[in-house]
């Protein structure tokens, strides 16, 4: 499912020279690249993987900003200090509630996919994109692992006829190949401690929401 025209990036280029807008008003996308094949890619800054995943999913630097996601945190739980939906030091680390609420503001919804199922049941033609939530090992510097884990958000999408991993930790988007290759990639991810969310465009799917259009007909309840 291709992006609606309002959600595509035009000819603007990201700034690849800085570390993001430190005043919290920008998207925090200091490490951004427009790839030669026209794919927009934000790279990791601080713990803003949720922000980068959303902007990479929608292919634009201004779809969401750090300040906007911070506002969503206080909308969901009206307090700034020790807000449960983000890092207490204000570096991001947004939880699933913020990601789902952000998608709703763009007329999309996130559907959790049961990882016990085979992803070959998915009706890829009606799915706008995918968000993966994966474990992330924390370390002190590059060498000393810390005894706790965090979670990392990343986006997956079909662009220019192929599926791509738009993980902000990658130097550039990674082509995952054809539909069949992508489904095999998802199957591998789901065998690990990874959570998959399907992103659906409510503007086109609202009439058939109860019919589980994200599944092929033979797999619907």
From Swiss-Prot:
Catalytic center residues: 49, 152
Keywords associated with the record: Hydrolase, Protease, Ubl conjugation pathway
Molecular function via GO: cysteine-type deubiquitinase activity
Domain (Josephin): residue spans on this chain: 36-214
Pfam families xrefs: Josephin
Catalysis: reaction(s): Thiol-dependent hydrolysis of ester, thioester, amide, peptide and isopeptide bonds formed by the C-terminal Gly of ubiquitin (a 76-residue protein attached to proteins as an intracellular targeting signal)
UniProt-recorded name of the protein: Josephin-like protein
């Amino acid at each position: 499912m291709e992006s609606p025209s309002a959600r595509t990036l035009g000819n603007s280029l990201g700034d690849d020279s800085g570390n993001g807008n430190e005043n919290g008003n920008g998207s925090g996308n200091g490490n951004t690249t427009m790839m030669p094949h026209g794919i927009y890619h934000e790279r990791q800054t601080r713990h803003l993987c949720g922000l980068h995943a959303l902007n990479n999913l929608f292919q634009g630097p201004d779809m969401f900003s750090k300040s906007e996601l911070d506002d969503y945190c206080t909308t969901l739980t009206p307090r700034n200090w020790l807000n449960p939906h983000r890092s207490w030091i204000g570096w991001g680390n947004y939880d699933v509630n913020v990601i789902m609420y952000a998608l709703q503001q763009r007329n999309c919804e996130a559907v959790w996919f049961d990882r016990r199922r085979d992803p070959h049941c998915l009706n890829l033609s009606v799915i706008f994109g995918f968000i993966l939530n994966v474990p992330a090992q924390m370390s002190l510097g590059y060498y000393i692992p810390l005894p706790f884990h965090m979670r990392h958000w990343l986006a997956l999408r079909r662009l220019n006829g192929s599926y791509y991993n738009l993980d902000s930790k990658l130097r550039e988007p990674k082509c995952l190949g054809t539909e069949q290759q992508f489904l095999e990639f998802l199957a591998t991810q789901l065998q690990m401690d990874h959570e998959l969310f399907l992103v659906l465009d409510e503007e086109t799917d609202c009439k058939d929401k109860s019919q589980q259009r994200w599944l092929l007909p033979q797999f619907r309840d």
